[in-house]
Amino acid sequence: MADKKAPATGWPVANGEYVVGNPESCVAVVTLGSHGLDEAAIEAGAAISGPCHTENLGIEKVIVNYISNPNIRFMVVTGSEVQGHITGQCFKALYENGIGDDGGIIGAKGAIPFMENVGQEPVARFQNQIVELIDMIDSEDKGKIQQTVKDCISKDPGAFEEDAMVIDLEGKAGGAGEEEGSSVKITSPEMAIIESRMRIISKQIEQAAIVNKYNSGYYNGKIQGVAIGLFLSLLIYSMLLI
């Protein structure tokens, strides 16, 4: 039987919208923008399962709950992708690449994928503790989710070698809800889409300005060249007349 460790006192330590199962289970499930899948995951043996809508504080809460339970070694990301936030892809990017010095998730495509309250050390702990992230993004098949959870349990490597890491996210964030208490706040997927598109438009405007500047310089150069040529032609013609 795989070795187990005690999770942090009062686990899960970060509040949110989730269902808790056996804290000694090696599997945790994120159901992204879907609802009605969590009970199925718990019935299959998951330690915790719940949705996650935002690519900043929402992800932080998931990370904090995972690293405070060293028994969690597998992460299943399933359910419908959250438009604008693209939370599922952000989870994958975080697991594969970590965060930069500015707290940004490297390679994430969400609107504002920044870790305000979780630094590089907790992220590294998350990357080391989770042995596999199973990508089931956009799947809402309860049967497949349950089978995936069971497959992970059959490969349980035992608890992570280090004890639970506790991050006081509530104290830092100062809020209670998933999307409250952080200086980075997305009010809706629609706003995230707008902000993402605004950034794309801004880049396109910059590129257009560069092209326009080049074309303007090229055009001005042609005018100057014609003027100089005409002047020299008139000068030579005048000299010939003399």
Curated annotation (Swiss-Prot):
Its topology with respect to the membrane? Answer: Single-pass membrane protein
Provide the catalytic activity annotation.
Answer: 5-methyl-5,6,7,8-tetrahydromethanopterin + coenzyme M + 2 Na(+)(in) = 5,6,7,8-tetrahydromethanopterin + methyl-coenzyme M + 2 Na(+)(out)
The answer to whether keyword Calcium applies is no
Complexes and interactors: The complex is composed of 8 subunits; MtrA, MtrB, MtrC, MtrD, MtrE, MtrF, MtrG and MtrH.
At the top of the EC hierarchy, this enzyme's class is: translocase
| Residues annotated for 5-hydroxybenzimidazolylcob(I)amide binding in this entry | 85
Query: Any idea where this protein resides?
Result: Cell membrane
Q: Say which family it is in.
A: Belongs to the MtrA family.
Q: Which cofactor does it need?
A: 5-hydroxybenzimidazolylcob(I)amide
What taxonomic classification does the UniProt entry list for its organism? Archaea, Methanobacteriati, Methanobacteriota, Methanomada group, Methanococci
GO cellular component terms, alphabetically, are:
plasma membrane
Please provide the record's keywords in A-Z order. Cell membrane, Cobalt, Membrane, Methanogenesis, Methyltransferase, One-carbon metabolism, Transferase, Translocase, Transmembrane, Transmembrane helix
- One Pfam match, by short name? MtrA
Q: What is its EC number?
A: 7.2.1.4
User: Per the record, what ranges lie on the membrane's Cytoplasmic side?
Assistant: 1-221
Name this polypeptide is given: Tetrahydromethanopterin S-methyltransferase subunit A
**Chief location of this protein within or outside the cell:** membrane
According to the UniProt entry, its GO molecular function terms are:
cobalt ion binding; tetrahydromethanopterin S-methyltransferase activity
Cofactor binding note:
Binds 1 5-hydroxybenzimidazolylcobamide group.
Positions of transmembrane segments = 222-242
Origin superkingdom = Archaea
What's a GO biological-process term for it? one-carbon metabolic process
Pathway(s) annotated for this protein in UniProt:
One-carbon metabolism; methanogenesis from CO(2); methyl-coenzyme M from 5,10-methylene-5,6,7,8-tetrahydromethanopterin: step 2/2
Organism of origin is Methanococcus voltae (strain ATCC BAA-1334 / A3)
